[in-house]
Amino acid sequence: MPYPLQLGFQDATSPIMEELLHFHDHTLMIVFLISSLVLYIITLMLTTKLTHTSTMDAQEVETVWTILPAVILILIALPSLRILYMMDEINNPLLTIKAMGHQWYWSYEYTDYEDLNFDSYMVPTSDLKPGELRLLEVDNRLVLPMELSIRMLISSEDVLHSWAVPSLGLKTDAIPGRLNQATLMATRPGLYYGQCSEICGSNHSFMPIVLELVPLKHFEDWSTSML
């Protein structure tokens, strides 16, 4: 989860988020090297008194600054496309959850169970218990088993919303009349917080998401108690 004065990403809790962090570091290193080179050239141009008079026709330089950017773009595009296809690939999910956005709460349905669904509202500040987080706690958490492939079906009943959990690398738009899907697999148990990430009205900031990832045995016990 985030903490005050945080400058980086949240700790990765899914394979997708780990890949996104690696891609971020890869791209940032390329940007850093380019920025350093440009800054070095600008510094040389500002500090030298020498003038090169033969740069009006420099075929070699033009060739280099045409090919080099293309190579750099390829080095960025290939890992990006790989991750993009990984995020869209859903193979044999063991559990399917349908998340519906409303103004201003989420409702969840476990489609593999006959009658397991509930609404998830934010807990008002006045009702918070010691240790709970303001604007992030909900009355009904989405309980899921860890280390299993889970398919999320996401849509909306009214306006545009966005179902986002940063530590899992998830952000999927909830669009009325359209069913979007995402894959989810957590590698560690715990509570994972997210929020609606699409401005959806006056209470947009009061639509938290709380995932409770538990071992499979605990999930089976919980689902049995809910039916």
Swiss-Prot record:
It is found in: Mitochondrion inner membrane. This is Cytochrome c oxidase subunit 2. InterPro entries: CcO_II, CcO_II-like_C, CcO_II_C, Copper_CuA, Cupredoxin, Cyt_c_oxidase_su2, Cyt_c_oxidase_su2_TM_dom, Cyt_c_oxidase_su2_TM_sf. It is an enzyme of class 7 (translocase). Mg(2+) binds at residue 198. Its main location: mitochondrion. It holds the Pfam family COX2_TM. Keywords: Copper, Electron transport, Magnesium, Membrane, Metal-binding, Mitochondrion, Mitochondrion inner membrane, Respiratory chain, Translocase, Transmembrane, Transmembrane helix, Transport. Component of the cytochrome c oxidase, the last enzyme in the mitochondrial electron transport chain which drives oxidative phosphorylation. The respiratory chain contains 3 multisubunit complexes succinate dehydrogenase (complex II, CII), ubiquinol-cytochrome c oxidoreductase (cytochrome b-c1 complex, complex III, CIII) and cytochrome c oxidase (complex IV, CIV), that cooperate to transfer electrons derived from NADH and succinate to molecular oxygen, creating an electrochemical gradient over the inner membrane that drives transmembrane transport and the ATP synthase. Belongs to the cytochrome c oxidase subunit 2 family. Binds a dinuclear copper A center per subunit. Residues 46-59 are mitochondrial matrix.
